[in-house]
């Protein structure tokens, strides 16, 4: 029933992914050995969205784990839920991609990709009605970005009508792990624009800010960041896994959020975010959730929605609440901040309600917005890319793996096109649309 196949690649992807499985196992009452220890029938009703049931009654995640070096895999395997995964679904090489996109996409990754695809096929054949794939990866490194995008394009060829959702960690503006991040990210975006259906854009710096500012953590670890991400990931699919009054799924999400096919990069947020100590003092109300979820400080990527306009947005509420109140709040947000929504898409906020809240909360909400301000992120990466590419710095690492400079130029111009598309729709007004069509007609001739 409506399965989602989960794929995680590279160090970042595997760490986010394993955190995500901890959250989902917890929600469905599945212990680290795969046995069901929950208390409610609802946990089992649609457990097969993410799990296969083995013959002995144990639940095995429908997950494929890949990396070009064994290190992260070993730590996943020895982690709290390491024993739950199917051992054959760990696919890894030995050499590593060394933060080099070309190695992940063309050389090392290309050697490993067939064994990954075999596992993906095997998992997909197990499914009743496969809804789509979710991929966790980062765009700054070599494996998640290079091999991740290679896998996405291969899956695209083989399953063209299934949804492809990615959780992509972009390089942060101030915090950089590797000097070649702008190259890797630009080459990846070039692929994601063409081959993914929906990209949830995350970045470490924004997550750090949330940890400092809202959660009051003095020294946030990657574990804390990944916890935020996994809360959002679980929120995106809760409608598939638990009954609700207003359901959404990956395809409905896409139809409601993507006005133009290339503009499928979303900012995500989660509410309520409270510091660990002060959780018990919070009474949650729908207005409070709404306020926190639309707050620019809560966005998990370093772009400020106040600098652009929302093309569309989707709010997924969880918990027992009145749908009437949810609708009122959403209309309220749009009326009060009408300048931040494009006027040529009327009622552009979709809401959905799922009855089961996350563990330890009475209600929660996940926010997904398609805002033109996401271009800040692409523009920033693009500037860093150009600065290095003008001097052809570090290029030999890529050309040495058989890449051509043309590919870089193409990726760069594709990214810049994306930025200007966002800008064009940010500036568009309802009555200007006619002029655009005239202009386009002239250009086409």
Swiss-Prot record:
Its cofactor is Mg(2+). Mg(2+) binds at residue 69. Disulfide bonds: none annotated. It is found in: Cytoplasm, Cytoskeleton. Keywords: Cytoplasm, Cytoskeleton, GTP-binding, Magnesium, Metal-binding, Microtubule, Nucleotide-binding. This is Tubulin beta-8 chain. CDD domains: beta_tubulin. Belongs to the tubulin family. The lineage of its organism: Eukaryota, Viridiplantae, Streptophyta, Embryophyta, Tracheophyta. GO terms for cellular component: cytoplasm; microtubule. The keyword Cytoplasm applies. Residues 422-445 are annotated as: Disordered. GTP binds at residues 11, 69, 138, 142-144, 204, 226. Residues 429-445 have a biased composition (Acidic residues). GO terms for biological process: microtubule cytoskeleton organization; mitotic cell cycle. The keyword ATP-binding does not apply. Tubulin is the major constituent of microtubules, a cylinder consisting of laterally associated linear protofilaments composed of alpha- and beta-tubulin heterodimers. Microtubules grow by the addition of GTP-tubulin dimers to the microtubule end, where a stabilizing cap forms. Below the cap, tubulin dimers are in GDP-bound state, owing to GTPase activity of alpha-tubulin. Signal peptide: none annotated. GO terms for molecular function: GTP binding; GTPase activity; metal ion binding; structural constituent of cytoskeleton. Dimer of alpha and beta chains. A typical microtubule is a hollow water-filled tube with an outer diameter of 25 nm and an inner diameter of 15 nM. Alpha-beta heterodimers associate head-to-tail to form protofilaments running lengthwise along the microtubule wall with the beta-tubulin subunit facing the microtubule plus end conferring a structural polarity. Microtubules usually have 13 protofilaments but different protofilament numbers can be found in some organisms and specialized cells.
């Amino acid at each position: 029933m409506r399965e989602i196949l989960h794929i995680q690649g590279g160090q970042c992807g595997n760490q986010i992914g394993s955190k995500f499985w901890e959250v989902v196992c917890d929600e469905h009452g599945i212990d680290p050995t795969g046995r069901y220890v929950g208390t409610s029938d609802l946990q089992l009703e649609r457990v097969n969205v993410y799990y296969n049931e083995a013959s002995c009654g144990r639940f095995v995640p429908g997950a494929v784990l890949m990396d070009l070096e064994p290190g992260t895999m070993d730590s996943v395997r020895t982690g709290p839920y390491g024993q739950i995964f199917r051992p054959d679904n760990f696919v890894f090489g030995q050499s590593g991609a060394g933060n080099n996109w070309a190695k992940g996409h063309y050389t090392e990754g290309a050697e490993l990709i067939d064994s990954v695809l075999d596992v993906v096929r095997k998992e997909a054949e197990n499914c009743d009605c496969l809804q789509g794939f979710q991929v966790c990866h980062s765009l700054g490194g070599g494996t998640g970005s290079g091999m991740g995008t290679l896998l996405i394009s291969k899956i695209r060829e083989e399953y063209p009508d299934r949804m492809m959702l990615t959780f992509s960690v972009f390089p942060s503006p101030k915090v950089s792990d590797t000097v070649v991040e702008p190259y890797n990210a630009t080459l990846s975006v070039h692929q994601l624009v063409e081959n993914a259906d929906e990209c949830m854009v995350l970045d470490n710096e924004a997550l750090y800010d949330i940890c400092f500012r809202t959660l009051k953590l003095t020294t946030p670890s990657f574990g804390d960041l990944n916890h935020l991400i996994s809360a959002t990931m679980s929120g995106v699919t809760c409608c598939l896994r638990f009954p609700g009054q207003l359901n959404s799924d990956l395809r409905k999400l896409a139809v409601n959020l993507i006005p133009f096919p290339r503009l499928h990069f979303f900012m995500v947020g989660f509410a309520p975010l409270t510091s660990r100590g002060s959780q018990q003092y919070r009474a949650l109300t729908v207005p409070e959730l709404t306020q926190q979820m639309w707050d620019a400080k809560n966005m998990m990527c370093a772009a400020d929605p106040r600098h652009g306009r929302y093309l569309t947005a989707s709010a997924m509420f969880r918990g027992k609440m009145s749908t009437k109140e949810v609708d009122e709040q959403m209309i309220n947000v749009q009326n009060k901040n009408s300048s931040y929504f494009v006027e040529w898409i009327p009622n552009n906020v979709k809401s959905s309600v799922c009855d089961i809240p996350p563990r330890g909360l009475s209600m929660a909400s996940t926010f997904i917005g398609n805002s033109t301000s996401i271009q800040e992120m692409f523009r920033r990466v693009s500037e860093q890319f150009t600065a290095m590419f003008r001097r052809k710095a570090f290029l030999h690492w890529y050309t040495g793996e058989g890449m051509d400079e043309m590919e870089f130029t193409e990726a760069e111009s594709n990214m810049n096109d994306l930025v200007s598309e966002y800008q064009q729709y940010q500036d568009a007004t309802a009555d200007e649309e006619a002029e655009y069509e005239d202009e386009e007609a002239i250009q086409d001739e």
